[in-house]
Regions:
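Transmembrane alpha-helical segments of polytopic membrane transport and secretion proteins
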Residues: 1-28, 262, 266-284
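Periplasmic/extracellular loop-to-transmembrane helix junction in inner-membrane transport proteins
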Residues: 7-23, 42-84, 245, 252-263
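Interhelical loop and adjacent transmembrane-helix boundary motif
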Residues: 59-62, 66, 218-274
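Hydrophobic alpha-helical transmembrane segments of multipass integral membrane proteins
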Residues: 73, 77-85, 89, 93, ...
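Transmembrane-helix boundary motif in ABC transporter permease subunits
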Residues: 82-114, 127, 284
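Amphipathic cytosolic juxtamembrane alpha-helices at the membrane-cytosol interface
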Residues: 102-106, 174-202, 282
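Generic hydrophobic transmembrane alpha-helix motif, especially the helices
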Residues: 115-151
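Transmembrane alpha-helices
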Residues: 162, 184-222
């Protein structure tokens, strides 16, 4: 009797399972298709304008050249500086919260602050970075100002991903290492962190992706210069100089055309209708 009831239930569930599987596959195919469509569209539209000279030269009005080499170097520079600061702090904070700190008000406050930082708009980070790092610390528009600001933005991402990665490590690893006489730090360094490394790397990659795509915060902190350093020593001096990333250059390229168009339209209306808004004899 029980076997017949089970078979009847299985048969009645089959249609629902079938439609569920179909819906899941359709959603997955649509997601991949949209991503591939965006990549193909950008590639087809942009491949004509990209060449070796465009990638290896800088934009110069005097020389009449257009390129993004300086912006590529600036982007890599900001990524390296930001990750050198944010990764140790984020991983260290996650290790403390997960392995050392006892559940209580302090841990709750730190986790609440982390979640709050993750939800703040990037423009707010940019304004804070401009006022605190740029003006109060006198770093002005520079790579350091932009990197310090981006560190605050990506810290929650690295911390939360590292925490989740550490939680996936079985407790038997911890108890086994302690039982064999290993110290806690030795156990964390040789067992927990290597076991959680895939999750930590995922957090780092997500943080790098956010840095590469960020423009609002860097517009207020790093500036928009796309110049290349002339020497290896100049590379270190450039840390205190303005530096425009690829997203900043993209933003400026799009907005400058709009500004020129709006300015031209305003001049035409001014000469045609006059300052008082009345018809004028002046020609556009």
């Amino acid at each position: 009797m029980t076997g017949s009831n089970t078979s009847i239930r299985t048969k009645t569930r089959h249609p629902a399972d079938f439609f569920t599987y179909v819906a899941i596959y359709v959603c997955a195919i649509l997601s991949v298709a949209l991503l591939l469509g965006i990549i193909v569209y950008v590639f087809v539209k942009g491949i004509r304008s990209v060449n070796w000279e465009f990638l290896t030269s800088v934009t110069s009005v005097l020389k009449g050249t257009t390129g993004i080499a300086g912006n590529i170097v600036n982007t890599l520079y900001i990524i390296i500086v930001t990750m050198l600061i944010a990764t140790p702090i984020g991983v260290g904070a996650a290790v403390y919260l997960n392995e050392y700190a006892k559940p209580g008000k302090l841990v709750s406050m730190i986790e609440f602050a982390t979640e709050t930082l993750a939800g703040i708009p990037s423009i707010i980070f940019g304004l804070f970075g401009m006022m605190f790092f740029g003006q109060t610390l006198h770093l002005k528009y520079s790579i350091l100002t932009g990197s310090f600001t981006l560190t605050l933005m990506v810290l929650p991402l690295i911390t939360r991903n590292t925490q989740e990665a550490l939680k996936t490590v079985p407790d038997s690893y911890r108890s086994g290492a302690i039982g064999l006489g290993a110290g806690k730090w030795h156990m964390i360094r040789t067992i927990l962190l290597p076991s959680a490394m895939p999750g930590i790397i995922t957090g780092v990659i997500l943080a790098i992706g956010r840095i590469v795509g960020e423009s609002a915060a860097l517009l207020f902190t790093a500036g928009s210069s796309g110049l290349l350093p002339k020497s290896f020593a100049d590379l270190f001096a450039k840390a205190k100089m303005p530096a425009g990333t690829l997203t900043i250059q993209l933003y400026l390229s799009a907005t400058c055309r709009t500004v020129r168009r709006v300015t031209f339209t305003g001049k035409v209306k001014y000469y045609r209708y006059g300052a008082e808004g009345k018809p004028s004899l002046k020609r556009a």
